[in-house]
Amino acid sequence: MSYRGPIGNFGGMPMSSSQGPYSGGAQFRSNQNQSTSGILKQWKHSFEKFASRIEGLTDNAVVYKLKPYIPSLSRFFIVATFYEDSFRILSQWSDQIFYLNKWKHYPYFFVVVFLVVVTVSMLIGASLLVLRKQTNYATGVLCACVISQALVYGLFTGSSFVLRNFSVIGGLLIAFSDSIVQNKTTFGMLPELNSKNDKAKGYLLFAGRILIVLMFIAFTFSKSWFTVVLTIIGTICFAIGYKTKFASIMLGLILTFYNITLNNYWFYNNTKRDFLKYEFYQNLSIIGGLLLVTNTGAGELSVDEKKKIY
């Protein structure tokens, strides 16, 4: 290549900073970045507009009349799986004892005591949570029942069982956070900001959201691509607390649809019925947690809440 002068010259002629050999490329990249940024902003605006439209459905006159009953209905959904499990143990008492004693080789006395304690604990704990009485003890007892049954029955072998149990615990935490009484002190008629109850509720809601999302990891990739896309968007938004009401509605509708169409245990009379019934009520518990979040909001540890501050 022939000599083209010192650095900064082209053919011996000095160049201005705006006429360098790479200035066109730099300008192109700048325009491209601006174009990409514009597209992302447009997508964000369209998404927020669509999300707001979905959230607006909750302002319907019929929904508004039902709103006072939503927390109670949500809590009942959350604990429905515990009622179902208790009644199943009682109705299949001899089968439960035979399975744990003969197949799992637990001592007979231990099996009887375990089943009695678990059944009574689930019935009492679920009832207390629905009535919002002693919710801290009720939540602890129900979480202990989930973990102890998983250990005794050996339900840690299947990933779907484990993730679903974590999601049920997430629903319990959300129900517990909803029951926290906001005892805010006042000074000069001004409410106390960032009370301990608010922070505790925020942490519980965040933990509950993350645990509920775990179930959708196994659920998502076994469905159609359209459902996969919607579920991924919904789970990300729900986990970080961005457009949380929209995410809760979308995930709740998706899970309700598949729960009714796939876990329709009422059409079966064989052993498959028990398995489908188990999955149906566990999914109903998760739906209850999602429904409760639409009413309570995402809490302090969320993008939605931070946007209000900043």
Curated annotation (Swiss-Prot):
PROSITE patterns: SURF4. The keyword Transferase does not apply. InterPro entries: Surf4. Residues 11-31 are annotated as: Disordered. Residues 130-137, 231-245 are lumenal. A motif (Di-lysine motif) lies at residues 307-310. Residues 1-108, 159-209, 267-310 are cytoplasmic. GO terms for biological process: endoplasmic reticulum to Golgi vesicle-mediated transport; Golgi organization. One of its GO terms (cellular component) is endoplasmic reticulum. GO terms for molecular function: COPII receptor activity. It is found in: Endoplasmic reticulum membrane. It comes from the Eukaryota. Keywords: Endoplasmic reticulum, Membrane, Transmembrane, Transmembrane helix. The chain crosses the membrane at residues 109-129, 138-158, 210-230, 246-266. It is a multi-pass membrane protein. Pfam families: SURF4. Belongs to the SURF4 family. Constituent of COPII-coated endoplasmic reticulum-derived transport vesicles. Required for efficient transport of a subset of secretory proteins to the Golgi. The C-terminal di-lysine motif is required for exit from the endoplasmic reticulum. Required directly for packaging glycosylated pro-alpha-factor into COPII vesicles. Facilitates retrograde transport from the Golgi to the endoplasmic reticulum. The di-lysine motif confers endoplasmic reticulum localization for type I membrane proteins. This is ER-derived vesicles protein ERV29. It comes from Saccharomyces cerevisiae (strain ATCC 204508 / S288c).
